Structure formats: C-alpha cells, structure tokens
Amino acid sequence: HHHFIEEGNDRGKLIMACGSGKTFTSLRLAETMTNGKGKILFLVPSISLLSQTLMAWTADADEAISPICICSDTKVSSKKTTDDSGMVSVEELAEPATTDVEKIRELIQIKQSVNPDGMLVVFSTYQSIEVIANAQKAIGDDFVFDLIVCDEAHRTTGVTLEGEEESAFVRVHDNNFIKANKRLYMTATPRLYKTEDQDKAKEKNVYLCSMDDENLYGKEFYRLSFADAVKKDLLCDYKVIVLTMNRKHQDKIQIEEDEDDTKAEHLDEWQK
C-alpha cells in the first residue's frame, strides 16, 4: 500500500515463496488500494490457477466481489504447451467463462449495476488478454482498471524479435494495450536476464523483458524468501529423505524379477 499509494508508484514487484500467501496478499492490497470498490484484472497462466484464485478471492474478500471469468474453451482450442487449460476445464469453473466481447461488456455493466459499491474482478488467463483489450474498447475510454495483478509474473518476461508480434504474456506491460492505473507483478521466482544478454538484445533491436527492468515491472517493494517464511511459521521446512538398500536385498529383488520374467516367457509359449 505504501509503495503504490503513498509513494505514488504505478508498478511494483511482490516476491514471495510458494505457498506463503501471494494470492491473499494481493487481495488485501486490492481492497486497501481501492477501498473495496475498484476494478481489478487478475491474470494467470492457466485455467486451473484461475479456478483456485477465483475461489480464494471469493472466500477471503472482506465484502462480496463481482467476478467475471475470461478464458478460452479447452474443447475447441488446440492442445499445446502454451495453452491455458491446465488440469481444469472451463465447465468446472465456479463462474461461467466466456471470450465473447459483447457478453463481457454486458456482464461488466450488469455486475456494476447490481453491486455498485463492490469490487469488480475480472479473472483471466494471459492468453485471453486481447479479448480484454477489445472489451475495454467496446465499453469506452472511461473503463480503466484500477489494478492489474500479474500472477506468476516471471512468465511475462521473454524476447520478442523485431517484426514479430508480442506474446500475450508480454503485452500486459503496455498501458496503451490494456489500460490500468497500477500494475502488481508477483512471483516466487523472478526471472532476470544477464547484462550481456540485455546488451546484445539492444544491439540487435530485440525487445527483451527482464524483471530487473523497473520501467516495466517497477521496484521490488516486498520480498519473503522460503527461509524467512519458515522462520515466521508460514511454511514448514522441507525434509530430505534418502532411501538406501544393501547389496543383499538388491540381489534378492533382481533374482525375483528374473524369475518373474522366466514365468512370463513360459506363459507366452503355453498360450501359443
């Protein structure tokens, strides 16, 4: 809150260990920054993560939120490693999802009229970011998000070659594409490119997004490492379990496996 409101920054990085409460922290930040009445865009890389976040924010919000889900239908989209499906289908979401711009425009207007004093939260995958941009244009210039929360923000780094179209993950940085007053980038694993790589990118007119670029990501205003989270009893320390086997037991297992293979061969012969 101090970073965004009192210092007036429009971008910032929140670095917290996995499981230490990034989602809950972002909810409280959004509520505090907008007095619980803002327009929030929450971006995630998969439908499964969208589902988790939707349920978490709905359950933990101080006041009831008005959620809208935007993501592609996995039944009609091609299955690629870059798709937004994860392990959950659109049909399993707690709220109906759509990528239809007109439906989104209508939903936003309905939600705002029904709950004018509540927080409107658009949950979306990065892959559907162009749909959000088109919906913003359809609604009008007055519809600007108060805050964009970029979860798994290390996914928004990368290289764009000259003449190529930016990926959906990278386009979130552009305020001319998606209009917002503030941007929160949160991750447990910030991705940084070496100085020499950044210099080479400049020489070759390559657009490089690295999380140490404060123009894109803002300053790091809070960090909670795994070790610190354990000290604060937010996480349990991990234990290393090493399994050992002596040679006697190893030989016994090998003999049993050989006997099983022999029995299988005899069975095959008998079946013939």
Task: Show which residues each predicted segment covers.
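Pre-Walker A adenine-sensing motif
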Residues: H1-E6
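Pre-Walker A (Motif I) flank of P-loop NTPase domains
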Residues: E7-K13, G38, L120
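Walker A/P-loop
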Residues: G8-L29
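Conserved Walker A/P-loop ATP-binding site and its immediately adjacent core
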Residues: T34-D62, S66-T81, Y126-S128
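Conserved helicase motor
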Residues: C69-K79, L93-E102, T125-V131, R155-T156
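Conserved helix/coil segment N-terminal to the catalytic DExD/H
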Residues: I104-V144
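SF2 helicase catalytic motif II
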Residues: Q127-S128, A138-Y185, T189-R191
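Interdomain helical connector at the RecA1-RecA2 junction of SF1/SF2 helicase-like NTPases
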Residues: T195-K272
